[in-house]
Amino acid sequence: MLERFRQGWQKVMRPLASGLLAMHVTPDMVTWIGTIGAVVMALVCLPQGWLWQGALLITLFIFSDSLDGNMARQLGRTSQWGSFLDSTLDRFGDGAVFAGIALYYAGPGHSTLWCGVALAALILSLVTSYVRAKAESLSMDAKMGIATRADRLLISLVAVEITGLARVGVLAHWLCWALPVGLCYLTVAGAITVGQRMTAVKRQSES
């Protein structure tokens, strides 16, 4: 759903990438800083119930996902190592967001049910990424699906932000349901995406 906007977003980020390169910041540095920042914010802010603050800070660090590749292309240094590092660290960031949400519901959110749903969304997000990686290692394509990484991040972080603002009275209280609804969608969409990718790989393997 959101992958179609990636090219336009890259153009927006190009000036910032150029500025960082002028300061002698490397793409790998941006990748590491972005991942560490996102993981720390997710595992510190969300379990404490600092939802809107955490979502905002995590989003800022996740911007590095667009920056590092943009910087590498401007340097003409795109490499297998850079792609591998970026994909590997992305999994840490994705996992930390859902783990932070699960810890929130295990603590101040007081809901075993939604903690479990958050863990299910976490597992499915990791399996979705694994299916694609394994398919590509077998020279097959499995990029399709209704819940790509960009979709998962946008929906989860927007849902956390809305719920956080509703909890502090900035938005209507009924919007506290934004996060549970978002988790339900991501769990169902994740399961469908895994099924779509497995089906695609099966068809390719039999053709």
What do the PLM-derived regions correspond to, one by one?
Residues 1-59, 97-207:
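Hydrophobic alpha-helical transmembrane segments
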Residues 50-77:
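Hydrophobic/aromatic-rich structural module bridging two neighboring secondary-structure elements via a short loop
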Residues 63-71, 84, 88-92, 96, ...:
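Active-site His/Glu-centered metal-binding helix of metallohydrolases
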